[in-house]
């Protein structure tokens, strides 16, 4: 059980590192827009079961690799990239604006008139965690830590530890 718990902790760290390496997102943004939870490790008929759960909301597009980062006026083109493997793409009919409460975001008009406008968002942290590259790396890391800790726990018990 302690080996499984240590593996889940390592999995959480690996998720954050891997998400950061695949997407243009900072650790502060990951922690602000998501919640990471553990299902407690349980003994069932089919063995030990444990899981890591991610919950969170979509992240404003301005938090990714976007130019310009400040509010602009006129016909300044907005370019954005969400994944590190992709280059910035120009977003047609988008603009950067600062709202009265101070929030800066990437917006687009819903119609030809000035209002209403809607903010553009990137993927949420749970959606990023579903990426195949991220999942594979995290799974490998969790298995590696569990196997190492299992050996350590067995050695401890066999050598008379409590």
Predicted regions located by residue number:
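Short, Lys/Arg-rich flexible segments
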Residues: 1-162
